[in-house]
Protein backbone atom coordinates (compact mmCIF):
# COMPACT_ATOMS: atom_id res chain seq x y z
CA UNK A 1 0.00 0.00 0.00
CA UNK A 2 1.19 3.57 -0.60
CA UNK A 3 1.74 6.47 1.76
CA UNK A 4 -0.61 9.46 1.63
CA UNK A 5 1.10 12.85 1.65
CA UNK A 6 -0.02 16.20 0.19
CA UNK A 7 0.32 16.31 -3.61
CA UNK A 8 2.14 19.64 -3.37
CA UNK A 9 4.71 18.56 -0.76
CA UNK A 10 8.20 18.89 -2.33
CA UNK A 11 8.93 15.30 -1.34
CA UNK A 12 6.08 14.07 -3.58
CA UNK A 13 7.87 14.54 -6.91
CA UNK A 14 11.15 13.12 -5.59
CA UNK A 15 9.47 10.01 -4.22
CA UNK A 16 7.45 9.42 -7.39
CA UNK A 17 10.70 9.59 -9.37
CA UNK A 18 12.21 6.98 -7.02
CA UNK A 19 9.26 4.65 -7.54
CA UNK A 20 7.76 5.01 -4.06
CA UNK A 21 4.02 4.45 -4.25
CA UNK A 22 2.09 7.53 -3.22
CA UNK A 23 -1.61 8.19 -2.86
CA UNK A 24 -3.83 11.22 -3.40
CA UNK A 25 -6.64 12.17 -1.02
CA UNK A 26 -9.25 10.90 -3.49
CA UNK A 27 -7.54 7.54 -3.89
CA UNK A 28 -7.23 7.14 -0.11
CA UNK A 29 -10.95 7.71 0.42
CA UNK A 30 -11.79 4.93 -2.05
CA UNK A 31 -9.87 2.34 -0.02
CA UNK A 32 -12.15 0.80 2.58
CA UNK A 33 -9.49 0.37 5.27
CA UNK A 34 -8.22 2.55 8.07
CA UNK A 35 -4.81 3.99 7.19
CA UNK A 36 -2.19 3.95 9.91
CA UNK A 37 -1.74 7.41 11.37
CA UNK A 38 1.97 8.25 11.64
CA UNK A 39 3.23 11.58 12.95
CA UNK A 40 6.68 13.03 12.27
CA UNK A 41 8.00 15.64 14.70
CA UNK A 42 10.73 17.06 12.48
CA UNK A 43 13.44 18.84 14.48
CA UNK A 44 16.05 18.83 11.71
CA UNK A 45 17.10 22.15 10.11
CA UNK A 46 16.58 20.95 6.54
CA UNK A 47 13.07 19.66 6.99
CA UNK A 48 12.42 18.86 3.33
CA UNK A 49 15.37 16.46 3.15
CA UNK A 50 14.23 14.69 6.33
CA UNK A 51 10.66 14.45 5.02
CA UNK A 52 11.94 12.65 1.92
CA UNK A 53 14.15 10.27 3.92
CA UNK A 54 11.38 9.26 6.31
CA UNK A 55 8.54 9.14 3.77
CA UNK A 56 10.68 7.00 1.45
CA UNK A 57 11.01 4.30 4.11
CA UNK A 58 7.48 4.51 5.46
CA UNK A 59 6.02 4.53 1.95
CA UNK A 60 7.84 1.32 1.00
CA UNK A 61 5.79 -0.74 3.47
CA UNK A 62 2.75 -2.74 2.24
CA UNK A 63 0.25 -0.77 4.35
CA UNK A 64 -1.62 2.45 3.78
CA UNK A 65 -0.09 5.19 5.92
CA UNK A 66 -1.16 8.79 6.43
CA UNK A 67 1.79 10.98 7.42
CA UNK A 68 1.27 14.12 9.52
CA UNK A 69 4.17 16.58 9.75
CA UNK A 70 4.55 18.27 13.14
CA UNK A 71 6.80 21.08 14.36
CA UNK A 72 7.60 22.73 17.68
CA UNK A 73 6.62 26.33 18.36
CA UNK A 74 9.78 27.14 20.31
CA UNK A 75 12.10 27.25 17.30
CA UNK A 76 12.10 28.73 13.80
CA UNK A 77 14.40 26.82 11.40
CA UNK A 78 16.75 28.85 9.20
CA UNK A 79 16.96 26.29 6.40
CA UNK A 80 13.26 25.73 5.69
CA UNK A 81 11.00 28.43 4.19
CA UNK A 82 8.25 29.70 6.47
CA UNK A 83 5.74 29.13 3.64
CA UNK A 84 6.65 25.43 3.66
CA UNK A 85 6.01 25.16 7.39
CA UNK A 86 2.67 26.96 7.12
CA UNK A 87 1.56 24.85 4.16
CA UNK A 88 2.51 21.38 5.37
CA UNK A 89 3.12 21.38 9.13
CA UNK A 90 0.89 21.30 12.17
CA UNK A 91 2.02 22.69 15.49
CA UNK A 92 1.96 20.35 18.46
CA UNK A 93 -1.04 22.23 19.84
CA UNK A 94 -2.92 21.51 16.62
CA UNK A 95 -2.41 17.73 16.91
CA UNK A 96 -2.42 17.41 20.70
CA UNK A 97 -5.99 16.08 20.81
CA UNK A 98 -5.31 13.42 18.17
CA UNK A 99 -4.20 9.81 18.53
CA UNK A 100 -1.44 8.28 16.40
CA UNK A 101 -0.52 4.68 15.67
CA UNK A 102 3.12 5.67 15.31
CA UNK A 103 5.13 8.82 15.98
CA UNK A 104 8.70 9.66 14.97
CA UNK A 105 10.78 12.26 16.82
CA UNK A 106 13.88 13.17 14.83
CA UNK A 107 17.30 14.34 15.88
CA UNK A 108 18.61 17.89 15.83
CA UNK A 109 22.18 19.27 15.54
CA UNK A 110 22.19 20.53 19.14
CA UNK A 111 23.65 17.53 20.93
CA UNK A 112 26.52 19.45 22.55
CA UNK A 113 23.98 21.57 24.47
CA UNK A 114 22.64 20.42 27.81
CA UNK A 115 19.03 19.35 27.35
CA UNK A 116 17.77 22.11 29.62
CA UNK A 117 19.57 24.69 27.44
CA UNK A 118 17.53 23.79 24.35
CA UNK A 119 15.02 26.56 23.66
CA UNK A 120 12.13 24.16 23.12
CA UNK A 121 13.06 21.61 25.82
CA UNK A 122 9.94 22.15 27.95
CA UNK A 123 7.72 21.81 24.88
CA UNK A 124 9.55 18.64 23.89
CA UNK A 125 9.06 17.23 27.39
CA UNK A 126 5.32 17.85 26.99
CA UNK A 127 5.41 15.97 23.70
CA UNK A 128 7.32 13.05 25.23
CA UNK A 129 4.71 12.78 28.00
CA UNK A 130 1.87 13.13 25.49
CA UNK A 131 3.17 10.14 23.50
CA UNK A 132 2.53 7.88 26.50
CA UNK A 133 -1.24 8.42 26.18
CA UNK A 134 -1.77 9.41 22.54
CA UNK A 135 0.68 7.25 20.58
CA UNK A 136 0.76 3.47 20.21
CA UNK A 137 4.48 3.26 19.31
CA UNK A 138 7.15 5.98 19.27
CA UNK A 139 10.44 5.95 17.35
CA UNK A 140 12.97 8.45 18.73
CA UNK A 141 15.93 9.06 16.41
CA UNK A 142 19.53 10.18 17.17
CA UNK A 143 19.40 13.28 19.44
CA UNK A 144 15.66 12.67 19.73
CA UNK A 145 16.46 9.19 21.05
CA UNK A 146 19.03 10.49 23.54
CA UNK A 147 16.66 13.21 24.73
CA UNK A 148 13.79 10.73 25.14
CA UNK A 149 15.76 8.13 27.10
CA UNK A 150 17.06 10.95 29.32
CA UNK A 151 13.55 12.32 29.86
CA UNK A 152 11.95 8.98 30.70
CA UNK A 153 14.82 7.23 32.49
CA UNK A 154 17.50 9.79 33.33
CA UNK A 155 20.05 8.09 31.05
CA UNK A 156 22.74 10.76 30.40
CA UNK A 157 24.65 11.52 27.23
CA UNK A 158 28.43 11.88 27.19
CA UNK A 159 30.58 14.04 24.88
CA UNK A 160 32.95 12.20 22.57
CA UNK A 161 36.59 13.24 22.11
CA UNK A 162 36.01 13.23 18.37
CA UNK A 163 32.87 12.88 16.30
CA UNK A 164 31.54 9.38 15.62
CA UNK A 165 31.21 9.88 11.90
CA UNK A 166 30.94 7.36 9.11
CA UNK A 167 29.56 3.90 8.41
CA UNK A 168 30.18 1.35 11.16
CA UNK A 169 29.53 -2.36 11.51
CA UNK A 170 26.79 -3.18 14.00
CA UNK A 171 25.73 -6.43 15.63
CA UNK A 172 22.24 -7.90 15.92
CA UNK A 173 21.95 -8.68 19.64
CA UNK A 174 18.34 -9.90 19.60
CA UNK A 175 17.60 -11.85 16.39
CA UNK A 176 14.18 -12.85 17.76
CA UNK A 177 13.05 -9.22 18.15
CA UNK A 178 10.16 -8.31 15.84
CA UNK A 179 12.06 -5.12 14.97
CA UNK A 180 15.06 -7.08 13.67
CA UNK A 181 13.15 -9.66 11.65
CA UNK A 182 15.26 -10.52 8.59
CA UNK A 183 18.35 -8.68 9.84
CA UNK A 184 21.83 -10.06 9.26
CA UNK A 185 24.03 -10.80 12.27
CA UNK A 186 26.36 -7.98 11.21
CA UNK A 187 25.39 -4.93 9.15
CA UNK A 188 26.35 -1.34 8.30
CA UNK A 189 24.74 1.76 9.84
CA UNK A 190 25.56 5.45 9.23
CA UNK A 191 26.61 7.37 12.35
CA UNK A 192 26.96 11.13 12.84
CA UNK A 193 27.09 12.40 16.41
CA UNK A 194 29.26 14.16 18.98
CA UNK A 195 27.76 12.38 21.99
CA UNK A 196 26.86 8.88 23.13
CA UNK A 197 24.77 6.98 25.63
CA UNK A 198 26.50 4.11 27.39
CA UNK A 199 25.55 0.49 27.85
CA UNK A 200 26.20 0.59 31.61
CA UNK A 201 23.55 3.28 32.11
CA UNK A 202 21.00 1.47 29.93
CA UNK A 203 21.64 -1.86 31.66
CA UNK A 204 20.64 -0.25 34.94
CA UNK A 205 17.09 0.32 33.64
CA UNK A 206 15.16 -3.00 33.73
CA UNK A 207 12.62 -1.90 31.09
CA UNK A 208 15.28 -1.20 28.45
CA UNK A 209 16.71 -3.82 26.08
CA UNK A 210 19.61 -3.18 23.68
CA UNK A 211 18.86 -4.57 20.21
CA UNK A 212 21.77 -3.22 18.12
CA UNK A 213 25.30 -2.29 19.12
CA UNK A 214 28.65 -1.50 17.52
CA UNK A 215 32.00 -2.45 19.02
CA UNK A 216 33.38 0.86 17.74
CA UNK A 217 30.62 3.40 18.41
CA UNK A 218 28.49 1.72 21.06
CA UNK A 219 24.74 1.37 21.51
CA UNK A 220 22.57 1.92 18.45
CA UNK A 221 19.00 0.71 19.12
CA UNK A 222 17.13 0.24 22.40
CA UNK A 223 13.60 -1.06 22.91
CA UNK A 224 11.38 -0.22 25.86
CA UNK A 225 8.59 -2.77 26.13
CA UNK A 226 6.55 -1.03 28.80
CA UNK A 227 6.28 2.26 26.93
CA UNK A 228 6.36 0.69 23.44
CA UNK A 229 9.21 3.04 22.54
CA UNK A 230 12.28 2.65 20.36
CA UNK A 231 15.44 4.69 20.80
CA UNK A 232 17.59 4.76 17.64
CA UNK A 233 20.83 6.69 18.21
CA UNK A 234 22.16 6.47 14.63
CA UNK A 235 20.86 7.23 11.13
CA UNK A 236 19.56 4.25 9.17
CA UNK A 237 17.34 6.72 7.27
CA UNK A 238 20.28 8.62 5.74
CA UNK A 239 20.62 9.04 1.97
CA UNK A 240 23.72 7.73 0.20
CA UNK A 241 25.17 11.26 0.14
CA UNK A 242 24.13 12.53 3.60
CA UNK A 243 27.52 11.94 5.23
CA UNK A 244 29.41 13.44 2.30
CA UNK A 245 27.21 16.54 2.42
CA UNK A 246 27.98 16.93 6.13
CA UNK A 247 31.68 16.37 5.49
CA UNK A 248 32.02 18.93 2.69
CA UNK A 249 29.86 21.41 4.60
CA UNK A 250 32.34 21.31 7.48
CA UNK A 251 35.34 21.41 5.14
CA UNK A 252 33.95 24.48 3.36
CA UNK A 253 33.29 26.13 6.73
CA UNK A 254 36.83 25.45 7.94
CA UNK A 255 35.64 23.11 10.70
CA UNK A 256 38.21 20.39 11.52
CA UNK A 257 36.69 17.09 10.40
CA UNK A 258 38.08 13.68 9.51
CA UNK A 259 36.93 11.66 6.53
CA UNK A 260 33.83 9.64 7.40
CA UNK A 261 34.85 6.17 8.54
CA UNK A 262 34.55 3.39 5.93
CA UNK A 263 32.37 5.54 3.66
CA UNK A 264 34.20 6.84 0.58
CA UNK A 265 35.69 4.07 -1.61
CA UNK A 266 39.43 3.78 -0.87
CA UNK A 267 38.99 6.80 1.48
CA UNK A 268 38.91 9.03 -1.59
CA UNK A 269 36.37 11.83 -1.14
CA UNK A 270 36.35 12.39 -4.91
CA UNK A 271 34.65 9.01 -5.40
CA UNK A 272 30.88 8.62 -4.91
CA UNK A 273 30.01 6.64 -1.77
CA UNK A 274 28.17 3.33 -2.00
CA UNK A 275 25.06 2.79 0.11
CA UNK A 276 25.54 -0.36 2.22
CA UNK A 277 22.67 0.18 4.67
CA UNK A 278 19.62 0.76 2.47
CA UNK A 279 18.19 -2.77 2.72
CA UNK A 280 18.42 -2.83 6.52
CA UNK A 281 16.87 0.64 6.74
CA UNK A 282 13.86 -0.65 4.79
CA UNK A 283 13.75 -3.79 6.93
CA UNK A 284 13.78 -1.80 10.15
CA UNK A 285 11.03 0.62 9.16
CA UNK A 286 8.99 -2.19 7.60
CA UNK A 287 9.25 -4.22 10.80
CA UNK A 288 8.26 -1.22 12.92
CA UNK A 289 5.23 -0.40 10.75
CA UNK A 290 4.18 -4.06 10.64
CA UNK A 291 4.40 -4.39 14.43
CA UNK A 292 2.25 -1.28 14.79
CA UNK A 293 -0.30 -2.74 12.37
CA UNK A 294 -0.39 -6.03 14.27
CA UNK A 295 -0.85 -4.48 17.71
CA UNK A 296 -2.56 -1.08 17.43
CA UNK A 297 -6.30 -0.81 18.21
CA UNK A 298 -8.56 -0.53 15.18
CA UNK A 299 -10.33 2.39 16.84
CA UNK A 300 -7.88 5.25 17.23
CA UNK A 301 -9.69 6.46 20.34
CA UNK A 302 -8.60 3.30 22.18
CA UNK A 303 -4.89 4.10 21.81
CA UNK A 304 -3.41 4.70 25.24
CA UNK A 305 -6.30 2.96 27.04
CA UNK A 306 -4.93 -0.58 26.97
CA UNK A 307 -7.96 -1.76 24.96
CA UNK A 308 -7.82 -3.42 21.52
Swiss-Prot record:
Please state the pathway this protein functions in, per its UniProt record. Answer: Amino-acid biosynthesis; L-methionine biosynthesis via de novo pathway; O-acetyl-L-homoserine from L-homoserine: step 1/1
One Gene Ontology term of the biological-process aspect is:
L-methionine biosynthetic process from homoserine via O-succinyl-L-homoserine and cystathionine
State the similarity comment: Belongs to the MetA family.
Subcellular location, principal: cytoplasm
Assigned GO CC terms: cytoplasm
What is an example of a Pfam family matching this protein?
A: HTS
Which GO molecular function, any one, fits this protein according to its record? homoserine O-succinyltransferase activity
NCBIfam families per the UniProt record, alphabetical = metA
Q: What EC number(s) is this enzyme filed under?
A: 2.3.1.31
Q: For this protein, what reaction is catalysed?
A: L-homoserine + acetyl-CoA = O-acetyl-L-homoserine + CoA
Q: Which UniProt keywords apply?
A: Acyltransferase, Amino-acid biosynthesis, Cytoplasm, Methionine biosynthesis, Transferase
Residues involved in substrate binding? 163, 192, 249
Q: Which residues form the active site?
A: 142 (acyl-thioester intermediate), 235 (proton acceptor), 237
* InterPro entries registered for this protein in UniProt: Class_I_gatase-like (IPR029062), HST_MetA (IPR005697), MetA_family (IPR033752)
Marked site (Important for acyl-CoA specificity) residue numbers: 111
What is the scientific name of the source organism? Rhizobium meliloti (strain 1021) (Ensifer meliloti)
Question: What protein does this entry describe?
Answer: Homoserine O-acetyltransferase
**Subcellular localization(s) per the UniProt record:** Cytoplasm
Annotated site residues (Important for substrate specificity) in this chain? 192
Question: What does UniProt give as the signal peptide span?
Answer: none
- Upper lineage: Bacteria, Pseudomonadati, Pseudomonadota, Alphaproteobacteria, Hyphomicrobiales
What is the annotated role of this protein in its UniProt record?
Answer: Transfers an acetyl group from acetyl-CoA to L-homoserine, forming acetyl-L-homoserine.
- Domain of life per record: Bacteria
Amino acid sequence: MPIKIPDTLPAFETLVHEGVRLMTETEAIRQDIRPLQIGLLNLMPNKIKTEIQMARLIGATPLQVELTLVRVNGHRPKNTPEEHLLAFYETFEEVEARKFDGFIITGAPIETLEYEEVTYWKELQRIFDWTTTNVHSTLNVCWGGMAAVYHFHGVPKYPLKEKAFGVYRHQNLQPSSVYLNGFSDDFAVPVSRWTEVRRADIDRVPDLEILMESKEVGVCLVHEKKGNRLYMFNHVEYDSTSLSEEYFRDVDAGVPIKLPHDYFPHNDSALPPQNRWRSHAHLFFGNWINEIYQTTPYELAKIGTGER
